[in-house]
Swiss-Prot record:
Its cofactor is Zn(2+). Binds 1 zinc ion per subunit. A motif (Endoplasmic reticulum retention signal) lies at residues 189-192. It catalyses: L-methionyl-[protein] + [thioredoxin]-disulfide + H2O = L-methionyl-(R)-S-oxide-[protein] + [thioredoxin]-dithiol; [thioredoxin]-disulfide + L-methionine + H2O = L-methionine (R)-S-oxide + [thioredoxin]-dithiol. Belongs to the MsrB Met sulfoxide reductase family. The active site is at C158 (nucleophile). The lineage of its organism: Eukaryota, Metazoa, Chordata, Craniata, Vertebrata. Residues 1-32 form the signal peptide. It is linked to Deafness, autosomal recessive, 74: A form of non-syndromic sensorineural deafness characterized by prelingual, bilateral, profound hearing loss. Sensorineural deafness results from damage to the neural receptors of the inner ear, the nerve pathways to the brain, or the area of the brain that receives sound information. This is Methionine-R-sulfoxide reductase B3. The modification Phosphoserine is found at S183. It comes from Homo sapiens. It comes from the Eukaryota.
Amino acid sequence: MSPRRTLPRPLSLCLSLCLCLCLAAALGSAQSGSCRDKKNCKVVFSQQELRKRLTPLQYHVTQEKGTESAFEGEYTHHKDPGIYKCVVCGTPLFKSETKFDSGSGWPSFHDVINSEAITFTDDFSYGMHRVETSCSQCGAHLGHIFDDGPRPTGKRYCINSAALSFTPADSSGTAEGGSGVASPAQADKAEL
């Protein structure tokens, strides 16, 4: 009987890890919500229209899953009361009361206005596992969510300023238009 040949243990472990990561990436492309494939979104805009309406940075972040530079976004240090919305379709996402300074360099929130407004997708880019957040109405990339936020949720929605628009609260303390989706005619091109 000849001796059984096996791979050296470090190589065997490395191959097993690679196989697990590939399987996780393949299976992890599943998401909660239904709007990662732009064809299934409730609100759809042509790429031509989005390039006209959005700044180059807004387009890069929301349509190409880009990330703006840390500490340079319009809303990083923003403290006014109001509602933060998706810059692409106007869906209300976050209240200013849930915004906090995480020190990360991006606007951070510990809760969303409506849990159905955001889609969560596993993201295995850059050799790590994160959870991407996208607008569930139009599929715009917003940022990522982490489990290191403050109470009561323990969540940190780390969101690119370029993915947001802001509606200030009026004198009665409520934000204008906090419940609707902006039409393309209503959405102004925001300059960052």
